[in-house]
Amino acid sequence: MTASAQKNIRNFSIVAHIDHGKSTLADRLIQITGGLTEREMTDQVLDSMDIERERGITIKAQTVRLSYKAKDGETYILNLIDTPGHVDFAYEVNRSLAAVEGSLLVVDASQGVEAQTLANVYQAIDNNHDIVPVLNKVDLPAAEPEKVKAQIEDVIGLDASDAIGISAKTGLNVDQVLEAIVTRLPPPMGDRAAPLKALLVDSWYDTYLGVVVLVRIIDGVLKKGQRIKMMGSGAVNDVDRVGVFTPKMVAMAELGPGEIGFLTGSIKEVADTRVGDTITEDKRPCADMLPGFKPAQPVVFCGLFPVDAAQFEDLRAAMGKLRLNDASFSYEMETSAALGFGFRCGFLGLLHLEIIQERLEREFNLDLIATAPSVIYEIQMTDGSVIDLHNPADMPDVVKIEEIREPWIRATILTPDEYLGSVLKLCQDRRGTQIELTYVGARAMVTYDLPLNEVVFDFYDRLKSISKGYASFDYQITEYRAGDLVKMSILVNSEPVDALSMLVHRARADARGRVMCEKLKDLIPQHLFNIPIQAAIGAKIIARETIKALRKDVTAKCYGGDISRKRKLLDKQKEGKKKMRQFGKVEIPQEAFIAALKMDE
């Protein structure tokens, strides 16, 4: 590839909130530049998983190389990386943005700027991108392009006077977007003669090719037959083939600086290829790694158990397969007295958890129970050591604990001002501290510090329901803070049920315990003896409900007569119940677990 060709490359990504038309715009760009024939076009070409299409979200970063003949007569190569828009995948977004020089900021002309647009745009600005604002859906009757332009200038501080108004659905003005990419975004820098240095953008498992790695070449050349080394994980592999996506896989002889493409080789484990890692040549390595690489850290943990114990091995195999494709998902085996064998899994966030669970159920036909999600707590022991607690059931003895620290987040919430009151109340209820409140037109932007523990449960759902779906929410984990946290156990018939124990803040323990007991009272069927259901902190019972016994009317056969006759029969029944209670076992049905773990307060 000659130097002249390098100046004709443009690498860009599309930044947008969920549902603002990012994937549809990508479809149009592919169609106009002739990347796929009419027959091969499906809606949302780049969202390859069914779940991605159904939920209308992009989970894995995808890439496509388009060739475009511009108005100046030259042919340009455009590399688009389609990034996820959701906060759980913020790290993937960051790495995708690091692989390109510019972004299209797509904003829905009827909705305006949302919280995740903000989060991703700030990441693009941090990566020194040139940004071209694009207003989508201008053909809608509710579109207010001028108002949204003003909003982009107020909230983000970008000059939106030359924003392009388009409709990705009908294809209106999309050709202007292509021209803007060529004229307003810079070509990539890079030295062809330098040692190979490439950014690993993403990787996934392909049944035929093994692990496919998506790379952006910074310096040097990547050819087949080379021996490459991942600097972060230290793995060394031989390259079998290199190529690009147009979105179909097309093999190439080599990839030069500034190009984005894929490589396959003797790589067996996706876990060896970490997003954000630097790839270099084994014999002639580059001097230093690209900045910003950090292995994905799971944030939310929960137990996944098969409803039918016979499916345990299938679940293990399915998790192994998913792990091939998604290295940010981690799991280890665990057993629970109530639920049998299963796995303790770590996720990037709640959406990630839902998606993994849904993929396990859908792609592998498994029935699963998920225990209540929890976060990682740091426990400072009295002997000076610090341990990480993933599962509330494993909490050490209270006497040995100096303090418990929990993760806190900095949340940014954008909401129409009529819902502001309810949003503030929700954050206060969740032990939040308000940091700032600013107005952007008719919308309020609130920044709160909140404990992650309060957010993983159902914060997002509550936020959406109190704001009729208009509020949007984004967060970063900031620090660990000491908190007054206690372990709440649930006892059924005086036996602790491990799957239902949780760490809660002392101030909220009473309410949580009461809700849990009331719930279980309705869910556990009656037995022939009384069943107490208790919530306890240590030895102190904080809430109790009793499931009354089923009993036979033993005095029915006595007509009139002496009271002592009835008394004798009743006492005999009482003795039997007492004995039964001593030896009786309470079976908790699976539905009870599932419902009790869905805490809709």
Curated annotation (Swiss-Prot):
A GO BP annotation: positive regulation of translation
Gene Ontology molecular function: any one: guanosine tetraphosphate binding
Domain tr-type G: 7-189
Protein name: Elongation factor 4
Localization annotation: Cell inner membrane
Top-level EC class as recorded in UniProt: hydrolase
Pfam families: EFG_C (PF00679), GTP_EFTU (PF00009), GTP_EFTU_D2 (PF03144), LepA_C (PF06421)
Species, as recorded: Xanthobacter autotrophicus (strain ATCC BAA-1158 / Py2)
Entry membrane topology: Peripheral membrane protein
Keywords linked to the UniProt accession: Cell inner membrane, Cell membrane, GTP-binding, Hydrolase, Membrane, Nucleotide-binding, Protein biosynthesis
Catalytic activity reported: GTP + H2O = GDP + phosphate + H(+)
Enzyme Commission number(s): 3.6.5.n1
The keyword Protease belongs to this UniProt entry's keyword annotation: no
Binding site for GTP: D19, H20, G21, K22, S23, T24, N136, K137, V138, D139
Annotated Gene Ontology cellular component terms: plasma membrane
Gene behind the chain: lepA
Family: Belongs to the TRAFAC class translation factor GTPase superfamily. Classic translation factor GTPase family. LepA subfamily.
Function: Required for accurate and efficient protein synthesis under certain stress conditions. May act as a fidelity factor of the translation reaction, by catalyzing a one-codon backward translocation of tRNAs on improperly translocated ribosomes. Back-translocation proceeds from a post-translocation (POST) complex to a pre-translocation (PRE) complex, thus giving elongation factor G a second chance to translocate the tRNAs correctly. Binds to ribosomes in a GTP-dependent manner.
